[in-house]
């Protein structure tokens, strides 16, 4: 069992100055989190000297592992030249052209600093382009922390949203409509019944923050069809899946091209970044070309963009996705064997380098995930931490693999699962 005495002391100090003792709610492990001292490869070390095999990987960005030497050198080289100018740089052109070459949905793009900014700006652009107000999101789909998308999942097929946080007036979310994932009939009905004022559909092609939950059959192609037929802008939020499922993200993996795409996490090489892009006629609405305003002091941050160029270059040159797919398949097969041997009513979900053990039946949507044993998973999380394996502390978060995870790491991890799954 790990001891966390120094982490507890830090948490006691932190909660006096930081709400909940953390800078983001997902880090608020109960009764207190471990505090990280360093990380390298697939290992993360806390201030008490405990070392863990890491399957959070900063919740997705570190597909090449922590402290990748190529990315590290790119950051150092840029820091020597300065790290914030307030002027355009050639780095933005280099990374922008590379992204556009990999994502057919992107003719033009803009760099921002976070995934939240990317989805917020994409929705604003879609509304400005269509001169319409309403949009559809998927129940349980996560698109950052801006007001319009912080909406509770409804119990029916579709609901007019109510805010999922205090401080958001209901008027801010009255144009946010929800449907269940993998329910094309509900999607079609809500689009067609609101067609006169329907601007966009925003969705994670693979639900990452309650999963991963995968599209069934031709669901994504059917969503593409109904949005095209009704002149609705389709936005794929690929902040998680971009550069993770394939170089061209989920849209390459599943063969579906949206009108707009948002990116983040991996494309910044582990530094803060966001991207929104799409068809030229939509992006030309963005200021200063058009009348949809968007701006940011740190947009196109040279250090972040330099790290992103390095990360994308390594991913492309080393053709990592085939290896990651094989690693993911190996791990998921091992987990399925353990669950079968123990005769547990659990489901192993995942795709490529994303995976999760659901403490319940196979989920197709948000309502299914809510039926999973959340308390059982929480106990399992702590048991795995005591076995020096760091998983997301919530049943609702995806586990990630990196190129730094070795076969020996997977074997150690499966041994821990075999002991702790019950």
Swiss-Prot record:
Modified residues (N6-(pyridoxal phosphate)lysine): 265
Record GO biological process: protoporphyrinogen IX biosynthetic process
CC per GO annotation: cytoplasm
CDD domains assigned to the protein according to its UniProt record, in alphabetical order: OAT_like (cd00610)
Alphabetized SUPFAM superfamilies for the sequence: PLP-dependent transferases
Top EC category: isomerase
Keywords tagged on the record: Cytoplasm, Isomerase, Porphyrin biosynthesis, Pyridoxal phosphate
UniProt-listed InterPro entries: 4pyrrol_synth_GluAld_NH2Trfase, Aminotrans_3, Aminotrans_3_PPA_site, PyrdxlP-dep_Trfase, PyrdxlP-dep_Trfase_major, PyrdxlP-dep_Trfase_small
Keyword Isomerase: yes
Pathway(s) annotated for this protein in UniProt: Porphyrin-containing compound metabolism; protoporphyrin-IX biosynthesis; 5-aminolevulinate from L-glutamyl-tRNA(Glu): step 2/2
Cofactor: pyridoxal 5'-phosphate
Record family assignment: Belongs to the class-III pyridoxal-phosphate-dependent aminotransferase family. HemL subfamily.
Protein name: Glutamate-1-semialdehyde 2,1-aminomutase
Gene this chain is encoded by: hemL
